[in-house]
Amino acid sequence: MSGTLPLAMTASESFVGMQVLAQDKEVKATFIALDRKLPANLKVPYMKNAKYRTCICPSSNHLVDDCVCEDVIIAYTAHRNNAVAALLYSDGNVIHRSGTLKPKSQNRFDLRGFLTSVNPGESSKAEAGTSKSTQKAYDRKDKSPSKGKNSKKGGKKSSSERKRKEYSSNSETDLSSDSDANTRKSKRK
């Protein structure tokens, strides 16, 4: 081996980036609740590529799912960053022309999602199952008229629609004829 050390990677070559988290009331309240000192700025590392998505917490190298880090908030935000960055960079490299999508300089993470997984039943979002925006989208789809060729009044009906109507009318007549036959039998007796 030669006596020279390898050159350090530049920020653009590195697989690890740093992201600053905004300190809002929710973050401060969470740190106070966990009896931890709030750092001056919440800088959290994240992985730029899903291929390298190991956990970035102070303990030894392991996957995100196997994390045993005691600093819950920093570990959680690092993991969340891993997942977000993996989506942005891995899929973005394939689709986006520039090759890389730059992360936002500041991001606010919803720590309630993590805390409700520890203490379920605290979040109304978790209880609802779907967000309001998702529900509105479903409602819009239900209300919007179909835009097919056959949706106009007086237009031709498709063969499947005709068959469905024929089947339903046949089944109704069968039921009515059965009930008529039963009433006739009872009258004869």
Swiss-Prot record:
InterPro entries with a match to the protein in the record: Pns11/12
ZnF locations on chain (C4-type): 55-69
Principal place of residence: host cell
Subcellular location: Host cytoplasm
Cross-referenced Pfam families: Pns11_12
GO cellular component: host cell cytoplasm
Biased segments, Low complexity type: 168-180
Keywords recorded for this protein, A-Z: Host cytoplasm, Metal-binding, RNA-binding, Zinc, Zinc-finger
Region feature Disordered, mapped onto this chain: 114-189
Keyword Amino-acid biosynthesis: no
Family statement: Belongs to the phytoreovirus RNA-binding protein family.
Function: Constituent of viral factories. Binds to ssRNA and dsRNA.
Protein known as: RNA-binding protein
Taxonomic lineage of the native organism: Viruses, Riboviria, Orthornavirae, Duplornaviricota, Resentoviricetes
